[in-house]
Amino acid sequence: MSHRTGLVLDFGGVLTTPLLPAVLAFEQREGLPQGACITALYMDEEGVRLTHELERGTISQTEWNEAAAPKLGVAPDNLMGRIFADLRPERSLIDAAAAAKRAGIKVGILSNSVGLTPWNLYDGYELDVLYDSVVISESHGLRKPDPELFEVALKQLGLAADECVFVDDTEEYVQAAEKLGFAGVRAQQPEQTIARLEALLGVPLTGAP
């Protein structure tokens, strides 16, 4: 098997801890029933439309906060930041990405935006320093699973899809990448994700640098 030479990573839920526990913790803090966010924002047609517009950059995070808050019955102030307040770096995947880069793999980020102000999901992660390419959906008026957004990431890396691995915690986006020629990896347990990446890239991703 020929090994891949590029690695494209989703951000939230891959280089961070999982999203769902953070959302559930927010619901508990706000006194909401469990599953309220999923129902209002990801199952409701209007909620889905709002999130897609945010990801494409056609509305701001503040506009999203103000539109989403009444659907949940909560205050709009920094709503996105409150929802994801419990997210933390997923250190094992961050370290694995760094190991891949040291081994000569080109490593890029491809993330659907949640807006950048007033709360910035990417603060403190030094994306522009640590990765060869950073593609945030709102900057391109697109969102995963749009094929054109994957093409932006590939162009920045200077690689073809069949030279790359794509990692995401959302199965729909993994499948979209696979249709383009990427080797897809669904991120669930970090240890399993890293083991799969080692097999696809042909380089060790754990241990001291």
Spans of model-derived segments:
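Conserved, well-ordered alpha-helix/loop/beta-strand core segments that scaffold catalytic motifs
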Residues: A99-A100, K106
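Σ70-family region 2.3-2.4 aromatic/basic alpha-helix that recognizes the −10 promoter
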Residues: I94, V107-L110
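Residue-level recognition of short, well-ordered coil/turn positions
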Residues: T58-I59, I105, S139, G158
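Structured helix-beta-strand junction loops
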Residues: A103-G104, L130
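N-terminal helical cap/lid subdomain that shapes the substrate entry/recognition surface
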Residues: S2-D95, R102, V114
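A generic structural motif
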Residues: G104-I105, F182
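Residues within well-ordered alpha helices
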Residues: A25-F26, H52, A67-A68, A99, ...
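Asp-based, Mg2+/Mn2+-dependent phosphohydrolase catalytic module
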Residues: M1-T5, L9, L110, V114-G115, ...
